Amino acid sequence: MVEQQQQEEDIWGQILRESSNKNNYFEKRDVAILGDPTSGKSLLLSKFDTVSNVESLKSIALSYTFSDIYEDDTSEDPVGRINYWSLEGEASQNDLLKFSLNKENIKNCMVIITLDFSQPWNLVESLKKWLGILEEHIKSIFKDDKNGFKNLQDKLSIKWHEYEEPTTTAATTTTTTTSNNIENNTNKTSPTTDKIQTNNVQKKKKKKVNISSAEDASVLPPLSENILINNLGVPILVACCKSDSVVMLEKDFDYKDELFDYIQQYLRRICLQYGAGLIYTSARKEINCGVTLEYIENILFGFELKSKTQLIEKDQIFVPAGWDTLAKIQVDFENQKVCKDTDEPYENIVKKPSIIKRREQTQTNSIICDDDQDFLGKIKSQLDNDDQSSINSPSTPSPLSQSSNNNNSNNNINNTSTPSINTPLQPTDKPLSDIKSSNNPVAASPSAERAALANFFTSLISKDKTSSRKDLKSSLASPPTTSVSSNAREDAKKELDKLKQQKK
């Protein structure tokens, strides 16, 4: 009995020891993601089945999340973990790059530079900017360790030589034609949804490729022309996000296939100099997101890459590092008719549309609103000026006076004996002012209305809320009264009394 209890305790102890050392079972790798603020980093990262909600990490200067990699769909324990560090993209935050890419993790790290393909006129400028920032940062890391930097450069050169084009293509293309979809359905694969596609890439059987035993780059054959002339010692992947924008560019800006080919070949030339891979992705249309994750696993963990190079579909370009050469680019470059001069600046061919310039100019002219109290104060002063001008200006003549003036002018022309307007009128029961007010009762009201409005805005400006409310209620409750209106009422009462006496 005692021996059985000891065996059970040993079993539980073994389980606890294994769980405590669980972190030692898988390797960890890091990915630093760089790019402009709206280049599509977060959406691309959200397709990698990360632990954190990537959308909630937006507008954070340096965000972090990770995803675990499993050997197959039946595995419970991960075989690897990828740590993703995403820099928001503001120039003032470049110093934070030291937390995601430093001397401790640079040997097991790769860099992804995201570009916004919906604005192709900014692609080269943005790519060169981030490559310059990355180069300056890496050189600052190894400023006192030249040998360490040389070892990383040799390692990247060896990785370039080791690339081999896959012999079979996995069903990881996110957007395919109808015929391809039928073929995929026959093979019981469904690449139509990105979530399924990403999980297939993560949970498929992982197979490590045979890595060459070469450790010295000097024994390898020399690289071809323009390859790795700017060797930073770190694997780089240039991801052109929002590649589904080709439809918008064709429709709104009249982009042709030849111009897309020119853009692709120009980017390939830059990637060749840094030994970088190139891929077009779209998180919204689920294009090449799974291929991107598969490529990351191949670079960091050495897992087999089953996706072939893609140069046919203009929104699904994929050129892995190690496949391209300057000769291949030149062959494709000669077939396009946009520009034959390789030294022509990119900005002269892919020009920024003028409509975008006007839109940016209107956005820069920001409108600053006045403070509420200042705004109400301006209205009050304007009302006060209107009241003052109405008092100083002569009153508008009534229709009666205008008609009498017309009669007077006509009588003067005809030299008749009819008295002019200056002739005294016969006495009546009502004064002329009362007649005017009775015929046009609104004549005296504008000043009263302005006074009410002035009181209203004065109450809003007042700091004392209680007193302002009382003034507002009193100004709105009591209608404007004048001495003219009271005289009119008395005259009306007298007329009624006269009528009553006549009936008697």
Curated annotation (Swiss-Prot):
Q: Where is the composition biased (Low complexity)?
A: 167-189, 392-425, 437-446
Q: Does the keyword Nucleotide-binding apply?
A: yes
Q: Which GO terms describe its biological process?
A: microtubule cytoskeleton organization; microtubule-based movement
| Primary localization class, coarse | cytoplasm
Provide the protein's localization.
Cytoplasm, Cytoskeleton
Q: Which GO terms describe its molecular function?
A: ATP binding; dynein heavy chain binding
The name on file for this protein is Cytoplasmic dynein 1 light intermediate chain 1
Instruction: State how it assembles.
Output: Homodimer. The cytoplasmic dynein 1 complex consists of two catalytic heavy chains (HCs) and a number of non-catalytic subunits presented by intermediate chains (ICs), light intermediate chains (LICs) and light chains (LCs).
- The positions annotated for binding ATP are G35, D36, P37, T38, S39, G40, K41, S42
One Gene Ontology cellular component term attached to this UniProt record is: microtubule
Region annotation Disordered: where it falls in the sequence:
167-195, 383-446, 464-504
Basic and acidic residues: compositionally biased ranges:
464-473, 488-504
Q: Could you say which protein family the record assigns here?
A: Belongs to the dynein light intermediate chain family.
Function recorded in the entry: Acts as one of several non-catalytic accessory components of the cytoplasmic dynein 1 complex that are thought to be involved in linking dynein to cargos and to adapter proteins that regulate dynein function. Cytoplasmic dynein 1 acts as a motor for the intracellular retrograde motility of vesicles and organelles along microtubules. May play a role in binding dynein to membranous organelles or chromosomes.
Q: Which domain of life is it from?
A: Eukaryota
Keyword set includes Cytoplasm: yes
Q: One Pfam family, please name it.
A: DLIC
Q: Which UniProt keywords apply?
A: ATP-binding, Cytoplasm, Cytoskeleton, Dynein, Microtubule, Motor protein, Nucleotide-binding, Transport
What spans are recorded as compositionally biased (Polar residues)? 475-487
